[in-house]
Amino acid sequence: MMSYLIVFFGAGIGGMARHMVNLTAMRWGLTEFPFGTLFINMLGSFLIGAVVETFALKAGLPQHWRLFLTTGILGGFTTFSAFSLETVLLYERGKVFLAASYAVASVTLSVGALLLALHLVRTLIRG
């Protein structure tokens, strides 16, 4: 039960941070291209790499902190960071083809699922 609360509070912090970055990008007039989201994805990927490597190299760090930072805060900030980590882990394990396949499939299927949802909802609502 405690792990659920750790993730819950972390995700709230991450979600608020994502919202703040997007609002800042809009205030700066960056509306033609999703710069806020691009920044969030890059920063989240960098941070999850730093956190995971720190926990891997430093024994004795409490795992509830890893859960709070990665699944919680960074999961709420961006799910792209988890995708980036999983792709790199496959690559580092020598599964280059699997890593590339996962990256291509994740992007293609995710965008495809969104397009399908748009089509279905528009069809249902418009009749």
From Swiss-Prot:
This is Fluoride-specific ion channel FluC. Belongs to the fluoride channel Fluc/FEX (TC 1.A.43) family. GO terms for biological process: cellular detoxification of fluoride. Na(+) is not transported, but it plays an essential structural role and its presence is essential for fluoride channel function. NCBIfam families: crcB, PRK14195.1, PRK14198.1. GO terms for molecular function: fluoride channel activity; metal ion binding. It comes from the Bacteria. Keywords: Cell inner membrane, Cell membrane, Ion channel, Ion transport, Membrane, Metal-binding, Sodium, Transmembrane, Transmembrane helix, Transport. It comes from Granulibacter bethesdensis (strain ATCC BAA-1260 / CGDNIH1). Pfam families: CRCB. It catalyses: fluoride(in) = fluoride(out). GO terms for cellular component: plasma membrane. Its main location: membrane. It is found in: Cell inner membrane. It is a multi-pass membrane protein. InterPro entries: FluC. Signal peptide: none annotated. The gene is fluC. The chain crosses the membrane at residues 1-21, 32-52, 71-91, 96-116.
